Amino acid sequence: MNIYAVGGAIRDELLGVPVQDRDYVVVGATPEQMTAQGFRAVGKDFPVFLHPQTQEEYALARTERKTAAGYHGFQFHYAPDVTLDEDLARRDLTINAMAREVSPEGALVGPVIDPFDGQADLRARVFRHVSDAFVEDPVRILRIARFAARFADFTVADETLALMRRMVDAGEVDALVPERVWQEIARGLMEAKPSRMFAVLRDCGALARILPEVDALWGVPQRADYHPEVDTGVHVMMVVDYAAKQGYSLAVRFAALTHDLGKGTTPADVLPRHVGHESRSVELLKPLCERLRVPNECRDLALVVAREHGNLHRVMEMGAAALVRLFERSDALRKPARFAELLQACESDARGRLGLDAQPYPQAERLRVALAAARSVDAGAIARGIGNDTEKIKEAVHRARIQAVAQALAIGE
């Protein structure tokens, strides 16, 4: 048998970037031979084995054939006579269809095996499909978009983009399971330049199918005095990229992506104003999160950001009572860590505007000071002093928090 390192490990090595994952293909072996050497079988649809020491994945060389629509509609063939080139031919992109042999000691040996000119496409910074079999797996559209967010200086080859559009038109994207869509979107959001992912998805038409609420934002004008970039879609991409540049969490980046969804449904006769877009954003966001089965942590933060971001931008004008009501609505008193992420998302919103990425955002520090003051109130002591009257306790704690915030900020109640 012969073992080869394949795919992303070879690509990243040639690009000079850290290798994130190592995948191996075994040519000329049977499942029985693998288990005899201590490998543990874990593959469900085709033979994949874990190395007895490293726990890295080793897959038997295979070919695949489309048998039904969607991500799972494949039939796999594996046998000792399946060649390395045949295995590489089933891969999505030329830059992912390269290999190097692995010595018995685990070292990469020999030249790069590159039957589809992946090295040339790496030099040209191009995503190009290996074969027309690309159209058989709709996940590949999402993968290319995610790779674009990681390798922001790459472009999609014209012929590959044409195939992607054909797939979208044929309804292949509609067959994707929600969990896989979310998985790829989430991974793309965590890359260095998430806006590139959405640019590719828009270009091939897939964004309108998987995230129509986001796709609707392009071409919607905003007031130029607040938003020099004018276009809402452009603004949202700047917000997401700012959050990524700061290294913020997935929850913050998702909130950045969805905070202005309501602007996509603003009546044309009131543009470029967007009165009430916050509540419309919330109403659009709820079914989106349900449809894609977005994790609770991401959904909950996104809903708070969508509802409250306009209020946070205006906190310099608020009195202590309004600030305490904001803390209570956003559950900041019980969940200060989530409130810190709310601040990050709103700061990203303020700075995700043309020419304003370094603009001060004093609202964040004001809110941090105010929240610390509100949380310093000893609600238990107040309750013990009042007794069993729940409403009186609630009102007294509320008043004490207002007074604490007013004192901390030296402002009126």
UniProtKB/Swiss-Prot annotation:
Belongs to the tRNA nucleotidyltransferase/poly(A) polymerase family. Bacterial CCA-adding enzyme type 1 subfamily. It catalyses: a tRNA precursor + 2 CTP + ATP = a tRNA with a 3' CCA end + 3 diphosphate; a tRNA with a 3' CCA end + 2 CTP + ATP = a tRNA with a 3' CCACCA end + 3 diphosphate. InterPro entries: CCA_bact, HD_domain, NT_sf, PolA_pol_head_dom, PolyA_RNA-bd, tRNA_CCA-adding_enzyme. A single active site specifically recognizes both ATP and CTP and is responsible for their addition. Mg(2+) binds at residues 21, 23. Residues 232-333 form the HD domain. GO terms for molecular function: ATP binding; CCA tRNA nucleotidyltransferase activity; cyclic-nucleotide phosphodiesterase activity; magnesium ion binding; phosphatase activity; tRNA binding. Comprises two domains: an N-terminal domain containing the nucleotidyltransferase activity and a C-terminal HD domain associated with both phosphodiesterase and phosphatase activities. NCBIfam families: PRK10885.1. The keyword RNA-binding applies. Transmembrane segments: none annotated. The keyword Signal does not apply. Magnesium is required for nucleotidyltransferase activity. Nickel for phosphatase activity. Pfam families: HD (PF01966), PolyA_pol (PF01743), PolyA_pol_RNAbd (PF12627). This is Multifunctional CCA protein. Catalyzes the addition and repair of the essential 3'-terminal CCA sequence in tRNAs without using a nucleic acid template. Adds these three nucleotides in the order of C, C, and A to the tRNA nucleotide-73, using CTP and ATP as substrates and producing inorganic pyrophosphate. tRNA 3'-terminal CCA addition is required both for tRNA processing and repair. Also involved in tRNA surveillance by mediating tandem CCA addition to generate a CCACCA at the 3' terminus of unstable tRNAs. While stable tRNAs receive only 3'-terminal CCA, unstable tRNAs are marked with CCACCA and rapidly degraded. Monomer. Can also form homodimers and oligomers. Keywords: ATP-binding, Hydrolase, Magnesium, Metal-binding, Multifunctional enzyme, Nickel, Nucleotide-binding, Nucleotidyltransferase, RNA repair, RNA-binding, Transferase, tRNA processing. GO terms for biological process: RNA repair; tRNA 3'-terminal CCA addition. ATP binds at residues 8, 11, 91, 143, 146.
